[in-house]
Design a protein with these regions (language model features):
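Structural recognition of the beta-strand scaffold that forms the well-ordered cores
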Residues: 246-251, 255, 285-291, 321-326, ...
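N-terminal secretory targeting modules
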Residues: 2-4, 12-15, 19, 25-250, ...
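Solvent-exposed loop/turn segments at secondary-structure junctions
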Residues: 125, 193-194, 253-257, 292-297, ...
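Surface-exposed amphipathic alpha-helices with a cationic face
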Residues: 353-361
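Phosphate-binding active sites in nucleotide-utilizing proteins
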Residues: 256, 264-296, 304-308, 313
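Oxyanion-hole/transition-state-stabilizing segment in secreted/luminal serine hydrolases
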Residues: 260, 292-347
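Short, solvent-exposed loop/turn and secondary-structure capping segments
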Residues: 197-203, 258-265, 298-302, 335-338, ...
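Catalytic His-Asp segment of secreted/periplasmic serine-dependent ester chemistry enzymes
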Residues: 307, 333-335, 372-452
C-alpha cells in the first residue's frame, strides 16, 4: 500500500485534504454544540476589581505578610466558626496573605442544577500573575470531603492549568457533572508557587480548607487549616434548560449575608433560591449573590461602587434576566451627615439608581428596586441621615422607574418603632439582619413577577 501511494501523489494530497476537512467538520460541530448550550450562573460572588482601602464598615484590610511555606493567617480545621456561628467581621478569620505550594478547597451552594459545569476565576485585584497548577470540581459530601466518583479535573483551553494575568478573568472548559439544585460543590485549586495577596471575597458563609501540596483530587483534604473566604473563585455556571435564567442580587453586606448562621445558607438570596426551587413554575430560576461588605452606589471605598462593578457583576453573569438592587445604606450612613466633608443627597443616589436601571435595560435585564432597610439604633444615624433614607425609599416606591419593587423596609421594620428593625430580625448591630430577618426579606418578594 505504501509503495502504491508513493506512485500516486494525488492520492496523498486527496487524503490530506479529506483529513483536514474532517477535522474542521468535527471542530465546527463541537463549536456549534458548545454554542447551543444554554449557560446560567448557579452561584457567584463578587471578587474585588482593585485593592481596597477598607473592609466592611471601616478599618484596614489584613496586611500582607512575607511569603511563608506554612499556611498563614488561617485557623485549624477544628476551630468553630465565629461568635455564635454567625457570619461577619466579628470572629471572621483573616484572609490568607499568600498561598504557596498549597491547595484550597472551597464550598459553593448551587441554586439551579445542570448536566455540565464550568467555573470562573478572577485575578482582578492582584499585582502579579496567578499560576493555577491544577483545578478540580466535585459534589461535596461533608466538611472537606467529596462524594466518591464525582471528582472532575478541570482544564483551561485544553490545558491542565493556567496563568491568569492581573485584572483578568478565566473560564474553565466545561465538564460533565450532574449538579443538583440546592447542593454543595467543592472547587479545589492548587497553586504551585507564591501567589502574593490573593484576589478574594472575604465573607464566605462556608468554610474553605487549605492543605499542603496538590491535594485537588483527594476525597478528603489532609490535615487542613481553614479560612472563610473565596480565593479567586468568582462564579460557577451550569448548562440548563432553554427557559432557565438567573437573578442577580446586587448589594452590600446585608445581601452578602453578614449576621446569618455559618454553613446554614440562610441569607435572603439562599432562602429565595429555595422558594423558587420548591415551585415547578419557578424551579428553572437561579439566584446569585453579588453582595459586597460596605458597598456603596456612588463611591469606591469598601470595594468599588455598584456603578463601577455593574458590568462585571451583573451584565457579564451567564443567563441574567433580573437584578434585585439593594444598595445605598452605606452611602447614607457614611456621607449623609449634615456636616459631611463629602456629602451625599437623595438626588445623588436617585441619579445613580437611574444609571443602573438604564444600563440594565440596555441589555434586556429587568430591575427590581428594593427599599433600604432601617438602621435606627446605630450611633451614626441622625435625623438628616434618616431623612435621606426616607426620601430614597419614597422614590423607589413611587417613581415607577423600576420594573418591580420589593419593600424590604416595610417587611422588616418594627411597627411600633419604624426607624428600627424588628427585634427578632436584628442580628444585634441594628443594621444586619438575623436568620429570621433574612427569611422575612425573602418572603417579601413576589416570585410571580419572575413568571412574566
Amino acid at each position: 500500500m505504501i509503495s502504491d501511494l508513493r506512485k500516486k501523489p494525488g492520492v496523498i494530497l486527496l487524503s490530506i485534504v479529506l483529513s483536514v476537512v474532517a477535522a474542521a467538520s468535527i471542530s465546527f460541530a463541537q463549536s456549534r454544540s458548545s454554542a447551543a448550550e444554554h449557560w446560567v450562573a448557579t452561584w457567584a460572588t463578587s471578587q474585588p476589581l482593585a485593592a481596597t482601602s477598607t473592609v466592611g464598615r471601616g478599618g484596614p484590610p489584613p496586611q500582607a505578610q512575607p511569603s511563608q511555606a506554612q499556611i498563614p493567617q488561617t485557623q485549624p480545621a477544628a476551630t468553630p466558626p465565629g461568635p455564635e456561628g454567625r457570619g461577619g467581621r466579628g470572629g471572621q478569620p483573616p484572609v490568607p496573605s499568600t498561598l504557596n505550594d498549597q491547595t484550597i478547597r472551597m464550598v459553593v451552594h448551587t441554586s439551579i442544577g445542570g448536566g455540565r459545569v464550568r467555573i470562573e476565576l478572577s485575578n482582578a485585584a492582584a499585582a502579579a500573575p496567578l499560576v493555577i497548577g491544577s483545578a478540580h470540581i466535585a459534589v461535596r459530601a461533608k466538611d472537606s470531603a467529596i462524594v466518591p466518583g464525582t471528582d472532575r479535573k478541570l482544564t483551561f483551553s485544553g490545558q491542565p492549568g493556567c496563568t491568569i494575568r492581573p485584572g483578568v478573568l478565566m473560564l474553565s472548559d466545561p465538564v460533565d457533572l450532574e449538579v443538583a439544585p440546592l447542593s454543595d460543590l467543592a472547587v479545589s485549586l492548587y497553586v504551585p508557587k507564591d501567589t502574593g495577596p490573593p484576589t478574594n471575597h472575604n465573607l464566605a458563609l462556608h468554610t474553605a480548607y487549605i492543605s499542603k501540596g496538590d491535594t485537588t483530587a483527594h476525597e478528603v483534604m489532609p490535615e487542613p487549616n481553614t479560612t472563610r473566604a473565596y480565593l479567586w473563585l468568582s462564579a460557577v455556571d451550569v448548562t440548563a434548560a432553554p427557559n432557565a435564567f438567573a437573578i442577580v442580587a446586587l448589594g452590600d453586606s446585608i445581601t452578602d449575608g453578614q449576621g446569618t448562621t455559618m454553613e446554614g445558607n440562610l441569607n435572603w438570596t439562599s432562602v429565595l433560591a429555595r422558594r423558587l426551587a420548591a415551585n415547578k413554575a419557578t424551579s428553572h430560576i437561579a439566584v446569585v449573590n453579588q453582595g459586597v461588605q460596605g458597598n456603596q452606589v456612588l463611591r469606591d471605598e469598601a470595594g468599588v461602587s455598584a456603578l463601577a462593578r455593574f458590568d462585571r457583576d451583573v451584565l457579564s453573569r451567564s443567563g441574567v434576566k433580573w437584578v434585585i438592587l439593594l444598595e445605598a445604606i452605606n452611602d447614607i450612613i457614611r456621607h449623609g451627615q449634615i456636616d459631611s466633608a463629602d456629602p451625599v443627597t437623595s438626588d445623588d443616589l436617585i441619579a445613580g439608581y437611574r444609571q443602573l436601571i438604564a444600563r440594565a435595560h440596555t441589555h434586556g435585564i429587568r430591575v427590581i428596586g428594593a427599599t433600604v432597610t432601617p438602621v435606627g439604633g446605630q450611633r451614626q444615624v441622625t435625623e438628616h441621615v434618616e431623612a435621606i433614607r426616607k426620601s430614597v425609599n419614597e422614590w423607589i416606591r413611587t417613581s415607577h422607574a423600576f420594573d418591580a419593587v420589593v419593600d424590604f423596609d416595610a417587611a422588616v421594620r418594627d411597627p411600633g418603632h419604624p426607624l428600627q428593625l424588628r427585634t427578632e430580625f436584628d442580628s444585634g448591630d441594628h443594621v444586619h439582619l438575623s436568620d429570621a430577618g433574612n427569611q422575612g426579606m425573602a418572603d417579601a418578594i413576589d416570585v410571580a413577577i419572575f413568571r412574566k
